[in-house]
Regions:
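Non-heme Fe(II) oxygenase catalytic core, chiefly the N-lobe of the double-stranded beta-helix
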Residues: 1-104, 109-138
Length: 138
């Protein structure tokens, strides 16, 4: 729950990073999937984003895509990102699902980071992904 992760951040850090942008890139995904690296893109998104329906702020950095914090010294950027990644992945912000036959999970990508832990053992699994359009994280 990245809303709670944001809420628990120190006020000074929130203030320091409130207007900062993170540079996101899909190059890691392309490398893993054998995609054409010419298709790599870099985009800027705020480190803290506001949910368009609830107005709640959330931490919006993920180790898989964020490469740096714009306008920060590279070492300082890396130090801050490592802290934010560690903070965001604390157990208290994690939901682990125990799979049962017929389960359906829906989540809001604007508020979470998700990661498959393969908790279904040797059981057959059928997965359907539905992606709806949404707002940019600004």
């Amino acid at each position: 729950n990245q809303h709670l992760a944001y809420d628990d951040l120190d006020l000074d850090l929130k203030s320091e990073l409130s207007e900062k942008k993170a540079i996101h890139s899909n190059i890691g995904v392309l490398m893993l999937s054998g995609g054409d690296l010419k298709d790599a893109k870099r985009v800027e998104h705020p480190i803290f984003r506001e949910h368009p329906e609830t107005g709640k702020k959330a931490l919006y950095v993920t180790e898989a895509f964020v490469k740096e914090i714009k306008d920060l010294d590279p070492k300082e950027s890396q130090k801050k990102l490592e802290f934010l990644y560690s903070h965001a992945s604390q157990e208290k912000y994690i939901y682990r699902h125990k799979w049962s036959k017929g389960d359906l999970i829906v989540w809001d990508n604007r508020s979470v980071q998700h990661f498959a832990e393969h908790g279904y053992g040797d059981n057959e699994r059928t997965m359907h992904r539905l992606t709806t359009s949404g707002s940019k994280p600004y």
